[in-house]
């Protein structure tokens, strides 16, 4: 089934029930259906095992962060002392298939576009989401962004990966603090209350190397 042809809406793509009724199904013989189910069950087991592996790697990063930085007496700064904050200017439907540059929106999926507005190292924080499930992406180079995507530049020569991790660790809290009804969103007032630990730069680099190594294990 190719349901994407029925998508409507820019901020929250959706499909009407009447469109589902237009789709047809291929009905295989019963024995063939059983074979397919057996294969799918094996796939589900592999996926579940892989999810457990990824969760364990995430726990390893968190444990390393606590070991290196928790209750060490390092300075703690608020959002506006850490980030230069701006946003993109485009609508989310400005993407182009096979475009030349990454286009960051509030979707977890990375889109493409043929023009760029930024050429830098940055963290990209989704500013709205239907369920308040935000994410943080890292990128260095030329890119563009949706008008509700926060583009974050560090004010000092700090590790982007360290602050990406600290932001990701706060996403559940941000979900709880979200405003809005059908579509949840974040404001600068909410973000401005967040605090970040600022360890020495050599320890930031050490943590970044560790995270990079663990991340490589995730894609093996």
Name what the model sees in each region:
Residues 85, 91-95, 118, 169-170, ...:
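Compositionally biased, intrinsically disordered low-complexity regions enriched
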Residues 7, 86, 97, 178-179:
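Short glycine/serine/threonine-biased micro-segments
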Residues 22-38, 46-105, 193, 197-220:
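Non-catalytic DNA-recognition/assembly elements of restriction-modification systems
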């Amino acid at each position: 089934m190719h349901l994407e042809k029925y998508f409507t809406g820019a901020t929250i793509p959706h499909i009407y029930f009447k469109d589902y009724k237009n789709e047809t199904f291929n009905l295989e013989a019963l024995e063939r259906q059983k074979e397919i189910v057996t294969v799918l069950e094996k796939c589900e087991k592999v996926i579940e095992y892989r999810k457990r592996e990824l969760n364990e790697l995430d726990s390893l990063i968190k444990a390393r962060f606590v070991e290196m930085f928790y209750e060490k007496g390092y300075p703690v700064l608020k959002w506006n002392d850490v980030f230069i904050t701006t946003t993109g200017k485009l609508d989310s439907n400005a993407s182009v298939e096979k475009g030349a540059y990454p286009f960051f929106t509030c979707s977890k999926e990375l889109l493409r576009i043929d023009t760029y507005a930024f050429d830098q190292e940055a963290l990209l924080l989704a500013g709205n989401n239907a369920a308040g499930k935000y994410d943080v992406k890292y990128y260095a180079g030329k890119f563009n962004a949706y008008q509700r995507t926060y583009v974050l530049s560090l004010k000092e020569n700090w590790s982007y990966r360290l602050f990406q991790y600290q932001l990701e660790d706060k996403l559940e809290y941000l979900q709880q603090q979200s405003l809005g009804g059908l579509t949840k969103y974040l404001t600068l007032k909410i973000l401005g209350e967040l605090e970040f630990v600022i360890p020495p730069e050599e320890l930031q680099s050490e943590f970044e190397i560790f995270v990079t190594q663990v991340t490589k294990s995730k894609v093996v």
